[in-house]
Amino acid sequence: MRPYLMFVSGITGVLGMSFAGEMSLLKTLMIFKVTFLSYGFGQALTDCFQIDTDSLSSPYRPLTQGVVDKNHFLIVSSVGLLYCVSVLAFYNPLNLLLGVLAGFGLATYTTFKRKWWAGPFYNSWIVLVLFLMAYLAGTGRTHFDLSNLIFSASILIVFFGYANFVLTGYFKDIEADRATNYKTLPVKFGRRISTIVSDVFGIAASIPVFVTIFSLAFDSFPYQIILKALVFAYAGIAATIFTQLNLHSVSRDSEAHQAIVPCVHSYILLLSSLAILNNPDWFIPLIVFYLFYLVLLKIRPAKEQI
């Protein structure tokens, strides 16, 4: 597992449940806990199906070294994901259906990763389902309010923001993917075309943030909340720009982490800005959340991998 990446699913869950308004502390912590853990269990599950390419790109991992048994990984990840879905379904039974859908997506992801036109989008819809599950668990509703500007923007940011993370992540595995017949976008069309596609994803994830914030500002939304949201939004945009500039300079797989790291920063920060619009009292907790992420990222054992 790469625990620093659990912050990606964690902030996705935070954004989803931020639409609920007032919640008990227990409910808030339970939803946060299972969304936070879901990345680790989901990653463990998908890793079981792509040992071939991971053995070349990440030979230091326990699974690729054979230190841990694949079947044990499958059991632990499946039980963990079942627990996460059960908690979210407890707060809203509709999440049982979405959980089954997400589980199917995780189990079949490797098949679609091999296709250049599918990988990032296929991964993104699974994460988007996690956002929707957190939304349903927090609000208790049976429908999605697409007329809510913040909610609609959240869908775009989660989908394209995560798609950009997936695509930039492919840049560190190009040689391994080529050798194992994973026809990802960088393998099929090269780094230059893939970088341009990444630029589009980055723009698609960034524009909705400012459209939402400034639309609310001109609609007499409390300026104190707007300012808090902008702290995260501007930092997120800066990280996005840094991501794209670095990605354009990547010429080897070993250099890709220079773009992947800020891409994760941008995802966490952009989602935090929208969560603040829904719940400004989470400003300090989200700063603490981000600082914890920085600490775990700093002490990760393999600096070239993320």
Q: What are these model-predicted stretches?
A:
Residues 1-306:
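Multi-pass alpha-helical membrane architecture of UbiA-family
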